[in-house]
Amino acid sequence: MKELKARYQTGEAQLKVKLQDHINNGGRISLTTDGWAGNNKLDYIAVTGHWQTKLGEHNSVLLDIIELTNPVHDGRYLCKKLLEVTNRLGITCAVMSVTRDNASPNDTMLEEFEAAVASQWGQMEEEDRLSFCCKFNRKDGDVRCCAHIYNIAVQAALKAIKSNPNEHRHHYQHEANRAILPDDERSAFFKIRSLAIIFKLRKLPRAQLKQMCTTLNIKFIDLMCDMPVRWNSTDNMLKAALRMEKPIRAVLMNQEWDQSVRRHLTPTDEDWDILKEMAVLFEIFRRPTVQSQAECYPTLRNTIPNYLHMIRQLNVWQSAVEKPTLKIAAGAAHNVLTEYFKKSMSTRHSFVSTICDPRYKLAVLAFLFDAEGGITSTNYKKGKAHFQHVYSQYSQRARGIAEYKRAQAERAVIDAQGSLSPSPEVEGQEDWRINPFHGFAEHMAQHQSVMPNVINTEIDRWLREPCISLDSTLDEQRAYMQSKAYDFPIISQMARDYGAIPATSAPSERVFSVAGNLIAKKRTKISSENVRYVLCLRSWGILVEADDEEEIIIDDNGQIVEQE
């Protein structure tokens, strides 16, 4: 681990060059950010960057991880830390979106960030202002992590049936022969959570469950107690319990190791029915959650279809009288998703990302909102208007840059001519300076015969172009967009920029999964500086993951020990 700091500085310099090349080619950067409290009792914020190259390559990289030294993590302070990263890398005015969780300080952070971007933009030279005219604004660039929203919806469903998980797992721990079932708990989930801890920590029950799984030829799965911040932990617990229902029933029916467990924590037939009803609800959220957290391909373009699909399924189940538990839970989840979906409809990013997808375009909105009137529906018209607005911004930027370069070239010619001896004047040579219709006759002769009867804009041509197959692979989608880059230059750029926006803050969360391994409970003295170096170098491919914990040795002062 020699010269760790020097390797970090070299890696950051290379990253900055890569980012600047992308920006100079007209590209924009999307960010994710999230906070984390480490085992070393320090708080951190991670910032990741995402973009697509002209070749369609999807880039996702850790930009920085910073220790939060201020005990009050308000929005202004978070914005200050975010700007430290973006200013140092020279990307502040190229940021188009920030994907974050729903914590209220993030609202202020993005408001402050928008103001900082506007201030920097106002101080730029004319050419740079033209290049960065599509600058960050919170209305269009604030992306709420949909995985967090899904979690809020599921937690609302669990709360509605009095089954939401307690923050403290010891709530479900029971001393031997002293197990109880609180009156305010819904028995099915309380019992399963309690059993998860019993089968995890008690040797005899665990051994009996494993043996019964072997006897019944059912794969043993660790039954892990869930946590409130991740609904999929509840889903995993529930799936494991239902897959091992027969072994669990058999063990609890015949066990003699704890009579209080037999009396209070053994699930009844009704309890198992409740768990199976809730498994139906979790199934609705499972695929969209997994899909939204991918890192190597676009995710935002599926947000609207997934929202509508979940809302419509929940709408069906909230009327299911024959499944009373599912009915209540689905109603609560439906209310949450509907509220957040309405908020998402007022922003442009999801619509633009969807319409730029060559498999979807506007056709998918006509399909999704068919019940509301299809192409005459309010949401279809809103989506089309959002797309046209963003196209207009990109088009104005392209025209502005082209006009600026033309004017600069013209000035250069004039300056060069002014420094030369005057040439003999040719009749009509300066006609273009005094005649506003100079060249019009030639233009008409060239174009009149092919002049269309209707306006044929790039948007019109894009929407008329047939959608490619819904089953097209990522490589096929990339190849298609590459082949159409000349025909649709503006929309191709929009597709690259909006296709890179992450639907969730999962990329930042993944950083902390790695950090959790680095800052182990027995290794809490590692300095924040070294945490930053190691995590960034891994993300940048300079420190490969094989150079893992065995090679990263920390001394008593929290410094990484260089190995022989």
Predicted regions and their residues:
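Structured nucleic-acid-interacting core domains from mobile-element enzymes and related host factors
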Residues: 1-61, 558, 563-564
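Short, hydrophobic/aliphatic alpha-helical segments
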Residues: 20, 88, 214-221, 486-501
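Mobile genetic element proteins and their domesticated derivatives, centered on retroelements
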Residues: 34, 49, 82, 98-101, ...
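Conserved, non-catalytic sequence blocks in retroelement Pol enzymes and Pol-derived host proteins
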Residues: 36-39, 68-75, 100-101, 228, ...
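Histidine/cysteine- and/or acidic
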Residues: 52, 57-239, 545-553, 562-563
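Extended, C-terminal/distal alpha-helical "rod" segments
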Residues: 63, 67-69, 96, 138, ...
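Short amphipathic alpha-helical "interface-anchor" segments enriched in bulky aromatics
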Residues: 150, 231-248, 494-520
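Polyampholytic, low-complexity intrinsically disordered segments
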Residues: 377, 384-401, 407-411, 519-564
